[in-house]
């Protein structure tokens, strides 16, 4: 009987201890990835990109924007969900610097930044700037996405504050892989429209790449050989540009998490420092 009496106090004791005023606050929910649909200005087709707002987002405060371009065969979700080092690094950098994070389809799984993809990305940037207080726009990507980042930055340097390209090509006239996909994207073969291939080759336009720029390469990369990107970096160094090259002679077609973070950190820190300098 005495034993039962003592047990009867347990619910009351628990109720007193777990008073509503002392209850733990529920964990803060991370912002959900938004799958955004829009109508492309260039051809009125429906296109998509993924948007992630930072946890500390405020519509009244300026935020910088990081756009991540997927590789050949992937789509807008690669840099949002993929656990590989390049993608995790981009997501972690966006969190660290409180960046708005966007990953577009830019037309196709095999886009290579042709005219339609270029138009879509320009439209996305303009629409995001009209909706949010965008301070600076950073561009990154791996493989096809890295190549496309260099292409877009050379075509629209006024829109981009920094570029981090992982395992890219900088010369489409020289590059020979994935030609069927590139021809579909660019609108013909390099023999038919050499000017279009040159236009989309960053190596030919170093004077336009005035923003901080970083590249990671693998010396044993046969998918996207590193030679043109090395040449581009050397030219930019001659022009006294702010550049970083991480060249791993024994690596293939990949960039580690640490190297991916390093090239992203470089462009953000250099661009931020450049932005804070008083006008001369």
Locations of the language-model features?
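C-terminal catalytic histidine-bearing segment of alpha/beta-hydrolase fold enzymes
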Residues: 113, 223-280
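Alpha/beta-hydrolase active-site loop
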Residues: 112-131
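Mobile cap/lid helix-loop segments that gate and shape the active-site cleft of serine hydrolases
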Residues: 78-85, 168-205, 211
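A domain-start/cap signature at the N-terminus of enzymes
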Residues: 21-63, 182, 192-195, 243, ...
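Primarily recognizes the serine-hydrolase "nucleophile elbow" in alpha/beta-hydrolase
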Residues: 130, 135-181
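Short substrate-entry loop that stabilizes the transition state in hydrolases
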Residues: 58-63, 68-112
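Short beta-strand/loop motif that positions the catalytic acidic residue
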Residues: 209, 215-217, 221
């Amino acid at each position: 009987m005495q034993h039962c009496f003592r047990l009867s106090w347990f619910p009351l004791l628990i109720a007193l201890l777990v008073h509503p005023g002392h209850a733990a606050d529920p964990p803060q929910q991370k912002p959900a990835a938004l799958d955004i649909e829009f109508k492309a200005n260039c051809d009125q087709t429906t296109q998509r990109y993924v948007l992630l707002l930072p946890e500390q987002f405020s519509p009244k405060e300026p935020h910088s924007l990081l756009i991540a371009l997927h590789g050949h065969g992937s789509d807008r979700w690669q840099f949002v969900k993929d656990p590989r080092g390049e993608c995790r690094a981009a997501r972690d950098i966006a969190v660290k610097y409180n960046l708005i994070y966007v990953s577009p389809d830019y037309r196709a799984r095999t886009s290579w930044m042709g005219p339609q993809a270029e138009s879509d990305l320009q439209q996305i940037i303009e629409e995001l700037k009209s909706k949010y207080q965008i301070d600076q726009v950073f561009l990154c990507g791996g493989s096809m996405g890295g190549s496309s980042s260099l292409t877009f930055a050379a075509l629209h340097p006024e829109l981009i504050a920094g570029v981090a390209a992982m395992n890219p090509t900088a010369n489409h006239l020289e590059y020979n892989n994935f030609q069927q996909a590139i021809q579909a994207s660019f609108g013909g073969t390099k023999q038919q429209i050499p000017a279009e291939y040159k236009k989309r080759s960053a190596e030919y336009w170093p004077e336009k790449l005035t923003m901080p720029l970083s590249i990671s390469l693998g010396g044993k990369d046969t998918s996207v050989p590193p030679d043109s990107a090395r040449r581009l970096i050397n030219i930019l160094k001659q022009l006294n540009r702010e550049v970083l090259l991480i060249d791993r002679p024994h690596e293939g077609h990949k960039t580690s998490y640490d190297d991916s973070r390093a090239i992203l950190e470089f462009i953000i820190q250099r661009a931020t420092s450049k932005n804070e300098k008083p006008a001369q």
